[in-house]
Regions:
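Conserved short-loop catalytic and cofactor-binding motifs
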Residues: 8, 83-86, 118
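Active-site glycine-centered loops adjacent to acidic/histidine catalytic or metal-binding residues
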Residues: 7-8, 36-37, 116, 145-146
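Histidine-centered catalytic micro-motifs
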Residues: 113-118, 140-150
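N-terminal active-site segment of His-dependent metallophosphoesterases
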Residues: 1-18
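Short acidic, glycine-rich surface-loop motifs adjacent to enzyme active sites
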Residues: 6, 102-122
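Extended active-site neighborhood of metal-dependent phosphoesterases/phosphodiesterases
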Residues: 14-107, 126-141, 149-172
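Residue-level marker for buried hydrophobic side chains located in beta-strands
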Residues: 3-5, 33-34, 113, 142-143
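Charged active-site motifs of nucleotide-sugar-dependent glycosyltransferases
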Residues: 2, 71, 110-111
Length: 172
């Protein structure tokens, strides 16, 4: 048993991350975490927010692990263009990392990709390439948060028929 916090865990106050880390440590199970758009440090309105403080406090933002027959990939999909504006998706460097990571995973394994902003909108950067990679596996699931409601979304067959589980964020 384990948990994954899919972001928006500090409500615009990244200085709370140390306390969040301590709290997650009391869960009695391993809990992994990703940053949401409300967890990145804001310098000012012009400078794009980044996850450096999240990495310092919580650990890497792009990583993977195996639990039984499941390969879990966690990635930061929040791309800030200023201190207030952001989009979602994966950079070319992240896509290369994902491709390399999955090259070691047998095709019969289940893969779960965890990130913050749902990919169902169709505008996420490198979304088609990510879905194509995941479609090569016997079973793949997408796990997101960001919204303030729960939704299950099945991508079209053209998108690999991937199942996106969208969980309401705890804050934001």
């Amino acid at each position: 048993c384990y948990g994954v916090a899919l972001g928006d865990i500090t409500g615009e106050k990244p200085d709370l991350l140390a306390g969040v880390r301590r709290s997650l440590g009391t869960a009695g199970i391993p809990v992994f975490a990703l940053p949401g758009n409300h967890d990145k440090y804001k310098v000012d309105d012009a400078t794009p927010r980044d996850a450096s403080y999240f990495r310092y406090t919580m650990g890497p933002v792009d990583y993977s692990f195996n639990r039984g027959d499941v390969h879990v990939v966690c990635m930061d999909d929040v791309i800030y263009t200023s201190g207030t504006e952001y989009t979602n998706g994966f950079t070319d460097a992240q896509l290369a990392w994902l491709r390399a990571d999955l090259s070691f995973v047998p095709k019969q394994k289940m893969v779960i990709l965890c990130y913050h902003i749902p990919l169902r909108s169709g505008t996420a950067r490198n979304m088609a390439a990510v879905k194509a990679l995941l479609s090569e596996y016997a079973e793949a699931h997408l796990m997101a948060a960001h919204t303030h409601y729960n939704e299950n979304f099945i991508n079209t067959d053209a998108d690999g028929g991937l199942y996106e589980h969208i969980h309401g964020a705890p804050c934001g």
